[in-house]
Design a protein with these regions (language model features):
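Short alpha-helical Gxxx[C/S/T] motif in the catalytic ATP-binding
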Residues: 130, 134
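Detector for a conserved hydrophobic position within an alpha-helical segment of the HATPase_c
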Residues: 137-139
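Short helix N-cap motif at coil->helix boundaries in the Bergerat
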Residues: 24, 106-114
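Conserved micro-motifs of the catalytic ATP-binding
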Residues: 15-17, 56-59, 122
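A conserved beta-strand-to-alpha-helix junction within the catalytic ATP-binding
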Residues: 18-32
């Protein structure tokens, strides 16, 4: 219940971003470590190869970690047992692109347009708030997020974040 209330509050009253220079290689490695025990217990491989040419970006590291954790935990649930979650990061124009790909059950084509809508869920136990919060945080950072999925094959969530943020948060 506390998680639901916290997520709901983040949707209606976004928090102020605590911006700082962020090394994405370090942040991604750290966020993967946070879910590694859960993934290992389900025999899910976590794959990430650091990209030495990746620029630092201006971001809120806690909020960005929250985004990645939500994507990883959704991927772990979608896979269930025995699968792979791959994370890639690369330069893309004046920003960076981060992709999280899983070998899970995928998302039905008719559900893709609603995936970031508050209260929409594909899971019996889900609140439908997690991806809405993810979308909100990415937008606060001046970025975008997209999903590509094929039922039975898995999903890829792709974030694009600018190197230098144009503030979009309420206190900005």
């Amino acid at each position: 219940l506390n998680r639901v209330v916290s997520e709901l509050l983040e949707l209606v009253k976004p928090t102020h971003l605590a911006l700082q220079a962020v090394d994405l290689n370090t942040l991604i490695n750290h966020s993967l470590q946070l879910v590694s025990q859960d993934a290992n217990s389900r025999e899910i491989q976590l794959r990430f190869t650091a990209n030495d040419t990746l620029p630092e970006i201006q971001a809120d590291p806690d909020r960005l970690t929250q985004v990645l954790l939500n994507l990883y935990l959704n991927a772990i649930q979608a896979i269930g047992q025995h699968g792979v979650i791959s994370v890639t990061a690369s330069e893309s124009g004046a920003g960076v692109k981060i992709s999280v790909t899983d070998s899970g059950k995928g998302i039905a084509a008719d559900q893709l347009d609603a995936i970031f809508t508050p209260y929409f869920t594909t899971k019996a136990e889900g609140t439908g708030l997690g991806l809405a919060v993810v979308h909100n945080i990415v937008e606060q950072h001046g970025g975008t997020i997209q999903v590509a999925s094929q039922e039975g094959k898995g999903s890829t969530f792709t974030l694009w974040l600018p190197v230098n943020i144009t503030r979009k948060d309420p206190q900005g």
